[in-house]
Amino acid sequence: MDYLSLSLTMIFVLIALFLSKSFKAGVEKDMIIATIRAAVQLLIIGYVLSLIFRGDHPVFILLMVLLMLAVAAQNVIKRKKNTIGSFWRVFAALAIVEIVTQGILLSLHIIPLTARYVIPISGMVIGNSMVLSSLFLNRLNSEVGVRKEEIQLILSLGGTPKQSIQRILTSAMKMSMIPTLESQKTLGLVQLPGMMTGQILAGADPIQAVRFQLLIVFTTMASAALTCVILSVLTYPSLFTVHQQLKQNE
């Protein structure tokens, strides 16, 4: 696709702007900002990746992954609803998930240690974990607020902080994983995933594209569960005081 063809796809943005204006949705400004940011960010990352792919040095790969982790963690904690999250807890959770998934893929020689493989797969894993982290923390924050009396009752009966919040953590984990699981159930029937579509458009054999897509599906499923479990372990102690009481501002 050349830049002329790409510019013609702006028709879809104009359609969205027209509909927003017609129905008084009031999101025209957000659409314009989102479009400009997406175009600029993707073009910049495209040129950066071209340089990294040419160098293909582990240090450049590591720096790129660290940047993705930092941006993802910041995006999660900047949401006002995630009041019980912190940058370093989220960053640590995302980093652990990345280390585990990439460690397995590289140690079993499923993918080679090259930028062309590690960076795109890391982006998908971190992106999926970022969404899961946001959903999990939102759900946990809301559940703690609604079930505060239940937590305090269990604590008053001699229960530990972990016991008082275990059911809430389980519920938050289940609800935050539902979108990922439901999306995976319809792969190939309702939607063709991004990596598979991209490879097919680039001329790859469809079966080869399916293999890589299944790699992503299995990896994101594991990363989803890992993200929730690690965030549970790292986050729940922050809800309680040193005297094992629920913090009043939660």
Curated annotation (Swiss-Prot):
Keyword Magnesium among record annotations: no
Subcellular location as annotated: Cell membrane
Gene source species: Bacillus subtilis (strain 168)
TM region(s), chain numbering: 3-23, 32-52, 57-77, 91-111, 117-137, 214-234
Keywords, in A-Z order: Cell membrane, Membrane, Transmembrane, Transmembrane helix
Cellular component, GO annotation: plasma membrane
Pfam family, one: UPF0014
Family: Belongs to the UPF0014 family.
Name of this protein: UPF0014 membrane protein YjkA
Primary localization class, coarse: membrane
InterPro entries: UPF0014_fam
Topology term for the membrane: Multi-pass membrane protein
